[in-house]
């Protein structure tokens, strides 16, 4: 379930969601490959990457109304792999308020998946750690519940500008003519640029939060709906 909030339309396929599906055939490959190919998916990308003794082959669509099953099966077939072990879901790709009605949200329920890549496990752990610290501070008597709600809301909201930039990238990518997109990718395929861009991407939700105290969040207006 996606938190309903004040908008009852915040449910698939009307909500800001991506749609992803992958298969897990047996096999091995040394490479991770991503295809930005409109014959596979008009708005999104296909992928293959190794995972132990199996492969992950899938299709992700930024448009939740685009059905990805047939194209996932076709991609697996084109790669000579069996379409078995299906796994997929809706992927919220827009950041939402992380508190509402006295409840703390982390992960998909708060829109913590990264909009351009749909990565969600790392971000769920990252915001989950921050949320857990606030809950612990309440249990230990260091904060009131309302203070913890406000602190966690501000922490999540302080990442909004990063999510907005990734969302802009998601919207722009399908509108770039494929040959131009290929040239842009080739031009950016330099170690210095790759290291710079990956480090910025990684630092959106760095695992260092486990051992380091997060930087104080900027002052943020907490919505009235945060309180129970």
Question: What spans do the regions from the language model cover?
Answer:
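Conserved mid-domain beta->alpha element of the FAD-binding
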Residues: 55, 94-162
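C-terminal helical "tail/cap" subdomain of flavin- and related membrane-associated enzymes
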Residues: 136-228
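A general structural signal for well-ordered alpha-helical segments in protein cores
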Residues: 18, 69-72, 103, 124, ...
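Contiguous hydrophobic segments
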Residues: 19, 23-27, 34, 60-66, ...
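Generic low-polarity alpha-helical segments
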Residues: 1-3, 131-132, 152, 184
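Short, charged/polar low-complexity linear motifs in solvent-exposed/disordered segments
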Residues: 51, 67, 73-76, 124, ...
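Predominantly flavin-linked oxidoreductase catalytic cores and closely associated redox partners
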Residues: 1-99, 111-112
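Electropositive phosphate-/nucleotide-binding environments in soluble metabolic enzymes
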Residues: 42, 65-66, 118, 122-125, ...
